[in-house]
């Protein structure tokens, strides 16, 4: 069995301002307001790893992919972030969490719980999860790295330090 080293951040998060849902413009302003340094690249919409690989986005190897998963009963939801080209074995991950039989959650659940469209899933969307019912899981390889992610829309990528992201998300948990 491959040994996955993961950072599990038990971040059952609220939205920032009650029912206020963050979009691309608002999350960029929020990062600025929180004095989190980031670099933003605008680009054509990227819907898949393959499309991203064909783009001219710099530091592509530092971009993360985000998997919105649920358990077999569709009662527990997880947002898993890892580097874009790292493979993951969902069976092994389910044993580490622990959760029975992980699978990809339905698009409707993603849009309702994270308020993002397909191709735009990002750890930043956890800030939109009003019901605090998503467990955020970060791969430990993200530590001490500058990582790239979509800012709520797949028409841009922002790069920021993992620790800044973690620090940003942590206060919104219980």
Regions found by a protein language model. Give the residues of each.
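Extended, low-hydrophobicity, polar/charged segments
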Residues: 6-174
């Amino acid at each position: 069995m491959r040994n996955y080293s993961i950072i599990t951040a038990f971040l059952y998060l609220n939205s920032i301002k009650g029912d206020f849902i963050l979009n691309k413009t608002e999350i960029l302003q929020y990062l600025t307001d929180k004095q989190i340094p980031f670099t933003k690249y605008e680009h054509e919409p990227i819907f898949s790893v393959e499309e991203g690989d064909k783009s001219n986005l710099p530091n592509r190897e530092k971009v993360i992919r985000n998997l919105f998963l649920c358990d077999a009963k569709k009662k527990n939801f997880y947002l898993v972030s890892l580097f874009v080209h790292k493979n993951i074995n969902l069976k092994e991950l389910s044993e580490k969490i622990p959760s029975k039989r992980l699978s990809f959650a339905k698009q409707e659940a993603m849009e309702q719980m994270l308020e993002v469209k397909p191709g735009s899933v990002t750890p930043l969307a956890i800030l939109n999860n009003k019901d605090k019912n998503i467990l955020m899981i970060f791969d430990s390889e993200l530590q001490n790295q500058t990582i790239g992610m979509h800012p709520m829309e797949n028409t841009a990528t922002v790069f920021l330090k993992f620790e800044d992201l973690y620090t940003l998300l942590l206060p919104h948990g219980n």
